[in-house]
Amino acid sequence: MCIRDSAVHSLFGLLLWQSKQLVRGELWMALATVGHQVEEQMLVMLQWHTAASHQDATDTWYGGRHIAQWLDPRLSAALPKTWSGYDVDGAWEALVATLDLFSVAARQVADTGRFHYPADDERQLREWLSERQPERTEPRRSDTP
C-alpha cells in the first residue's frame, strides 16, 4: 500500500469516526478533534492534486496558505461547503461535502497512475453514511427568507 492509498483510507476512517460521533450527539468532538484531522487529510490530497495537475513546480506552501492561488478553481469553489457551523445538520452536510470534494481530487490523482482509488470502499462508506444521516431538522440558512 502506498502513502496515497493510506491517505484515502485514513480519510475514510476519519469520516466514519466523525459520523459516529454525530450519531452519538458528540458534536464538539466531531467538529473540533476529528474535524481537524479530516482537514489535514483533505489538505494533503489537495496538494497532491495540484502537483499532479501541473507540469511546472507549483508551490502549495504549507498549512493551506494561499490556497486560493494554487488550488484548482473548481475544487476551490467546493471548499466552503466542507466547513460547518456548530450544528448537527451543518456538520453532516459538511461531512458529505468533504467526502465529495476529496473523492474528486483523489480520483483525479489516481487517474494519473499514482495509485488505485478504492471506489468500492467509498461506495460502502457512502451507504453507511446515508443510512445514518438524519433528515434535516431546520431549514438551511439559504432556505429562509
What function would you assign to each model-found segment?
Residues 4-145:
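Conserved nucleotidyltransferase catalytic core and NTase-mimicking acidic/glycine-rich helix/loop elements
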